[in-house]
A protein has these predicted regions:
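Short linear motifs at protein or domain termini
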Residues: 1-110, 227-230
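Hydrophobic, amphipathic alpha-helical faces that serve as interaction scaffolds
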Residues: 96-112, 150-186, 225
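Hydrophobic packing residues in well-ordered alpha-helices of helical domains and bundles
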Residues: 93, 120, 145, 149, ...
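Amphipathic coiled-coil alpha-helices
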Residues: 100, 123-126, 130, 141-144, ...
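Short loop-to-helix capping motifs
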Residues: 45, 161-163, 206-207
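Short helix-coil transition/hinge motifs at the ends and kinks of transmembrane helices
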Residues: 9-11, 132-142
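C-terminal all-alpha effector/ligand-binding and dimerization domain
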Residues: 2, 16, 128, 174, ...
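Amphipathic alpha-helical dimerization/coiled-coil segments
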Residues: 100-132
Length: 230
């Protein structure tokens, strides 16, 4: 009879406070992404605690996580606020993306295996078949398209095999997505479908130079479209 060693204990179930913090975090994140809180608006822990029926400690824990996502700023007086909409902020985010994402993409092209290729192809297929706008959501990108768009870009980067770099990608993506959702489609002459097709084609052809060139151009056009109107 084969003997086995002692099994590792299961992780403890989430406590009530942890569950509440998760719920408040998810609510805050969704509310900010929907635009329920205007750019620059204060996120007052006392008000949020009263609205959600939870303690200040739970709200503060959730707010710290939202700050980590790039969806809120922590102010010098220890308050919190939604990031203010400014050209400088979004151009800084765009510069960071243009610096980091081409490196990740090149690593993916060089390291990605056949499973990575399949994920990229599937993500691009989903994106290409998802309408960017719906009558219900007007001139803003639809939730379904926004998620398909994120999954495609994430799939392109996943072949890099570096979870730390992917965490950086996720944070920058969330911050730029917030800016994009606050803006409308300001470049109607842009052919995003073709840009994504060229990205997929170059990546799967293992042409790192072309893939990164297309990506930089893609990110530059996105940054130009997110420039705040005067």
């Amino acid at each position: 009879m084969t003997q086995t060693g002692p099994t590792s204990p299961l992780p403890p179930p989430p406590t009530g406070k942890r569950m509440l913090s998760e719920q408040v975090y998810a609510h805050l994140r969704d509310a900010i992404m929907r635009g329920d809180h205007a750019p620059g608006a204060a996120l007052k822990p006392q008000d949020l605690a009263r609205e959600q029926g939870v303690s200040l400690a739970v709200v503060r824990e959730a707010l710290v996580r939202v700050v980590g996502d790039g969806l809120a700023d922590r102010l010098p007086n220890r308050g919190f606020a939604v990031p203010a909409y400014s050209d400088r902020r979004w151009q800084e985010i765009a510069e960071a993306r243009r610096t980091i994402e081409p490196v990740l993409l090149r690593m993916s092209v060089e390291r990605g295996d056949v499973d990575w290729e399949a994920r990229v192809r599937a993500a691009h297929h989903r994106l290409s078949r998802t309408p960017p706008y719906t009558p219900e959501e007007g001139e803003y990108y639809s939730e379904a398209w926004s998620e398909a768009h994120r999954l495609f870009h994430r799939a392109l980067m996943e072949g890099c095999g570096n979870p730390v770099l992917l965490e950086t990608f996720d944070r920058l993506w969330t911050a730029s997505e917030l800016a994009r959702r606050w803006s409308t489609h300001r470049n109607p002459g842009r052919d995003g479908v073709e840009e994504h097709r060229r990205l997929e084609e170059a990546a799967l052809a293992r042409d790192a130079d072309t893939a990164t060139e297309v990506l930089v151009r893609h990110l530059t056009l996105t940054a130009e479209g997110l420039t705040a109107q005067g």
